[in-house]
Regions:
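Catalytic phosphate/metal-binding cores of nucleic-acid and nucleotide-processing enzymes, i.e., regions
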Residues: 1-8, 25, 105-106, 110
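N-terminal segment of the canonical double-stranded RNA-binding domain
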Residues: 12, 16, 20, 25, ...
């Protein structure tokens, strides 16, 4: 069992929205993931790449957005709500890639939810 890292697209969006936390890894435009010691002097075109869990926590604590992952007979989906009061913001509208409009794994649904939450900022 391993922690999932966010994708390059999500890492780029996180940086655009102000994510500046230390991450053990960076990802380049070539999609190669490398270990780093410091976020100072990152290689050109490299982006800090957190785990999905850290990205989710950052959104919750700094942007007041909580991503709820739910399970149905068709797979996994997500809803985005305000972290402080549960006010609905957006959900997946059954737009997932499988036949039931969901995602086959929890991690796929969370990745999509992360990207959609970042678009709301």
């Amino acid at each position: 069992m391993t922690e999932e890292l966010v994708t390059l697209d999500t890492a780029k969006m996180l940086r655009e929205k102000g994510f500046n936390e230390y991450c053990r890894f960076v990802i380049g435009e070539d999609r190669v993931i490398s270990d780093i010691i410091s976020t100072w002097n990152l290689p050109p075109n490299s982006f800090p790449v957190p785990t999905q869990s850290i990205a989710n926590k950052w959104l919750r604590e700094t942007k007041n957005l909580h991503i709820e992952i739910y399970r149905s007979a068709c797979g996994y989906g997500y809803a985005i709500v305000k972290a402080n009061n549960g006010t609905w913001m957006k959900d997946d509208d059954a737009k997932g890639p499988n036949d039931g409009g969901n995602w086959d794994t929890y991690e796929e649904a969370l990745e999509e939810g992360l990207q959609e939450a970042l678009k709301l900022i």
